[in-house]
C-alpha cells in the first residue's frame, strides 16, 4: 500500500500530466502543473510515454471520454468502471500509462463540456486509484524509479521493444472499456423509460 510519503509524489505526477495534456489541447492558460518542460525525470517519462500512447492508439482511444457521455452525476462511476476494466487483466506499465491518458482525456472532456470543476475531482480519483489499487503493484515492480528507467531520458526506444506486448493488450482492454461504457449508457437510457 502507499506510504504517506508517496502521496505528494503521486499527486504531483497526476497534476503535472493532466496539466500538460490540457495545455496540449489548448484548454489551460497561465502557470501551473504541466507548464513548460518537466524538471522531474518521472514527470518527463510519463509525458513521453503518454505522448507515445496517444500516437499509437489515437484511432482506438481518441473519443473514449466523449463516448462515455460523462455528466457530473455519472463521472466517478464511469471513471471507476473504465479504470477497473483497464486493469482487469492485471496491471502493467502500458496500462498504467493508458490510465493516465484516460484520466487526462476525461479532464479535457470535462473542460470541453464546461464542467471544469470535474477536473480537480478526476485528479483526486486518479490519485486515490493509484494509491489504493495500484500502489502495491507499482512498489513490487520497482516503483516509479523503474518506470522512469523504462520510459525516461532516452530509454523510450529500448523500452518500446520490451513492452510491445503491453501496448497490444491495452488496445484490447480499451476496446472493451468503450463497449462497456456504451452498454452502461444504453442500459441507463432504457432503465429511465
Swiss-Prot record:
Single biological process term from Gene Ontology: intrinsic apoptotic signaling pathway in response to DNA damage
Compartments reported by the entry: Mitochondrion membrane
Modified residues (N-acetylalanine): 2
Keyword Acetylation: yes
Motif (BH4): 9-29
Swiss-Prot/TrEMBL keywords: Acetylation, Apoptosis, Membrane, Mitochondrion
Main location class: mitochondrion
Membrane topology: Peripheral membrane protein
UniProt signal peptide: none
Molecular function terms, GO-annotated: channel activity
A Pfam family matched in the record: BH4
InterPro entries hit by this protein: Apop_reg_BclW, Bcl-2-like_sf, Bcl-2_BH1-3, Bcl-2_fam, Bcl2-like, Bcl2_BH1_motif_CS, Bcl2_BH2_motif_CS, Bcl2_BH4
Domain notes: The BH4 motif seems to be involved in the anti-apoptotic function. The BH1 and BH2 motifs form a hydrophobic groove which acts as a docking site for the BH3 domain of some pro-apoptotic proteins. The C-terminal residues of BCL2L2 fold into the BH3-binding cleft and modulate pro-survival activity by regulating ligand access. When BH3 domain-containing proteins bind, they displace the C-terminus, allowing its insertion into the membrane and neutralizing the pro-survival activity of BCL2L2.
Function of the protein: Promotes cell survival. Blocks dexamethasone-induced apoptosis. Mediates survival of postmitotic Sertoli cells by suppressing death-promoting activity of BAX.
Full protein name: Bcl-2-like protein 2
